[in-house]
Amino acid sequence: MTILVAEDDMIMLKTIEYRLKKDGHNVIVSHDGREALEEIERSSPDLIITDIMMPFSSGLEIISAAKKKNGKKISVIVLSAMGQENVVLEAFQLGADDYITKPFSPNELSMRVKRYELVISGVQSL
């Protein structure tokens, strides 16, 4: 599965990238929102994992762009330190499929990604 990770914190980005690659995924990284928006158009990933607060474009803009992409359903997991209810609700209203608050467990992220991989491949449960 091809996963786009949009995260401006380099340590966090490398942690997520390492875990996803270890799980066998093709990982595309974006260091800011603008790069992520360009990558959505260029590569059309199966899944996006995005932070909310990033330079140039926010994770909320990334969710909107992913959900407007024609021809392909792109699932979005938000991974953010912003756990305020209004932010979480806005993310879901824009079309986020999941929301994980930092700090997070790499094992939990791995299991959630696995769940989306199974859904994408047509299997509905673990």
List each language-model region with its residue ranges.
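The feature encodes the CheY-like receiver
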Residues: L13, P55-F56, Q84, K102
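Alpha4 helix (beta4-alpha4-beta5 surface) of REC/receiver domains from two-component response regulators
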Residues: E17, E61, G83-D98, R115
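Charged docking surfaces used in two-component/phosphorelay signaling
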Residues: K14-K22
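C-terminal output helix
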Residues: N86, F104-K114
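Short hydrophobic/Thr-rich beta-strand motif most characteristic of the beta2 strand and flanking loop
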Residues: G24-H31, E39
